[in-house]
């Protein structure tokens, strides 16, 4: 086949808020430490491992790229449409999110509504996504006041976790695959284009592809990245 034998591990990393960005968070949990240490240790105890790679899409793609930046234990990573460019991804969602949560009286009241509801509306999912980010990057509340004016300090906490910010500090990445759809409905193509350009300026080698598509229905991209990851793990071992 196109791909050499490999062990594929697909852990359930959903949280009570749904999303997971794979960083250490006081509210959501120490998911970065879990990936770097706990999961790798468990796998090494069970199997004969020659190396480790990370691949993910959307939040998982974000996790792959930042863990590749911050950890030194991954032999290859692949980021499919991973969160990047927080201004255009999350910042422009604050007004809509604020409107939704204030229907219920605030963030905590909205979360109570979601947990007790028999079903969720489409707008509930997007609101919950932003609140999951707030719990990951800050104190669980939105980085805006009741008039949707940004709290600069709180928003800076979010931006400190944007790959566009992190790449200025963490530049020793393993072999890295990045791709994104040119019609991504969350504007991620703009952030990842900026990251791609900055990595080129910094001389950081990476595989880059922008494909025809959106943020949805992109599982087929794994047909390209998984064989690439396995090949790079073999080269490193």
Regions of interest found by a model, annotated:
Residues 1-237:
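Non-catalytic cap/lid and distal C-terminal segments of serine-dependent acyl enzymes
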């Amino acid at each position: 086949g196109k791909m050499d034998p490999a062990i594929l591990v697909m852990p359930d990393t959903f949280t009570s808020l749904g999303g997971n960005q794979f960083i250490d968070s006081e509210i959501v949990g120490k998911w970065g430490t879990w990936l770097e240490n706990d999961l790798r240790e468990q796998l090494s105890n069970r199997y004969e491992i020659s190396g480790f790679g990370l691949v993910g899409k959307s939040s998982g793609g974000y996790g792959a790229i930042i863990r590749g930046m911050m950890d030194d234990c991954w032999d290859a990573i692949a980021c499919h449409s991973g969160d990047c460019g927080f201004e255009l991804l999350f910042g422009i969602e604050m007004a809509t999110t604020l409107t939704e949560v204030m229907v219920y009286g605030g963030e905590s009241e909205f979360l109570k509504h979601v947990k007790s509801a028999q079903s969720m509306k489409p707008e509930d999912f997007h609101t919950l996504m932003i609140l999951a980010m707030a719990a990951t990057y800050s104190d669980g509340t939105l980085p805006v006041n009741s008039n949707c004016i940004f709290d600069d300090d709180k928003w800076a906490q979010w931006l400190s976790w944007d790959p566009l910010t992190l790449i200025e500090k963490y530049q020793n990445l393993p072999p890295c695959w990045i791709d994104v759809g040119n019609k991504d409905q969350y504007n991620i193509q703009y952030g990842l284009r900026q990251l791609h350009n900055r990595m080129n300026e910094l001389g950081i080698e990476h595989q880059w592809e922008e494909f025809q598509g959106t943020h949805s229905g992109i599982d087929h991209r794994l047909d390209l990245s998984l064989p690439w990851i396995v090949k790079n793990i073999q080269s490193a071992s």
